[in-house]
């Protein structure tokens, strides 16, 4: 294997952790390569499109450094036109999920990170250099691999669910519970495990009433 075909660092995943790792690696002159994920219907339904779950979130109120205000001029100067065209117009309420993720991506790219819009299907960690198999075909060899694939929300799979994401349907109470659209409303949490009960308890701070719906006759929590 030639040195030209061997990567120093390959990062799998394009959420906040992936871009932060890429920025650090790029500033350290390691020339990282990020596989940000493929743009496919399967990934869209699973919530694993490029830029991670945060890109599916509207308002982001709990990330330091972005108070409410008009960021339109800053976004115009910080992001290339082709990336700005992929986002909804800035509404002026602070930073949105897609905007925050595009800024993280651009910061990593500015320092020399290379990005491939494809999935990694398999990694052989049995020997170094490691071998990564691309979904589109072909292999990548790397001295180091950072897996930053994050988590996937556990949606119900209802036909109408997709239509109401970020319009009243959420998969994260801590992320969204304090937003105005949920305050002083009757809210429903579906599930009976530890996470469901923790989320329901948290939402009592904001909701007028919280209903916990579980398919069994007793909670697993």
Predicted features and spans:
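Rossmann-like dinucleotide/flavin-binding elements
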Residues: 2-6, 11-40, 49, 165, ...
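Core beta-strand elements of the Rossmann-like FAD/NAD(P) dinucleotide-binding domain
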Residues: 5-7, 134-144
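Generic structural signal for helix capping and beta-alpha/helix-loop junctions
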Residues: 42-44, 125, 156, 220
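Conserved catalytic-core motifs of eukaryotic protein kinase domains, centered on the activation segment
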Residues: 45-47, 54, 156-160
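Glycine-rich beta-alpha-beta "Rossmann" dinucleotide-binding loop(s) and their flanking helix/strand
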Residues: 145, 149-172
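N-terminal Rossmann-like dinucleotide/flavin-binding domain of flavoprotein oxidoreductases
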Residues: 51-139, 219-221
């Amino acid at each position: 294997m030639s040195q030209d075909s061997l990567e120093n660092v390959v990062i799998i995943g394009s959420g906040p952790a992936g871009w932060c790792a890429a920025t650090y690696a790029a500033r350290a002159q390691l020339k990282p390569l990020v596989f940000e994920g493929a743009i496919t219907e399967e990934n869209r339904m699973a919530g694993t499109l490029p830029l991670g779950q945060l890109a599916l979130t509207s308002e982001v109120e709990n990330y330091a450094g972005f108070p409410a205000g008009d960021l339109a001029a800053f976004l115009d100067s910080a992001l290339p036109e082709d990336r700005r065209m992929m986002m909804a117009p800035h509404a002026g309420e602070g930073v949105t999920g897609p905007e925050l993720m595009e800024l993280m991506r651009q910061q990593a790219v500015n320092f020399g990170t290379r990005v491939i819009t494809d999935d990694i299907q398999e990694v052989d960690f049995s020997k170094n250099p490691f071998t990564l198999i691309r979904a589109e075909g072909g292999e990548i060899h790397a001295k180091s691999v950072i897996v930053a694939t994050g988590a996937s929300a556990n949606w119900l799979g209802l036909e109408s669910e997709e239509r109401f994401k970020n319009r009243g349907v959420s998969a994260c109470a801590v992320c969204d519970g304090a937003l105005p659209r949920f305050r002083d409303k009757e809210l429903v949490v579906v599930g009976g495990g530890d996470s469901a009960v923790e989320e329901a308890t948290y939402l009592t701070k904001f909701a007028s009433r919280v209903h916990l719906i579980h398919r069994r006759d007793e909670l697993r929590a």
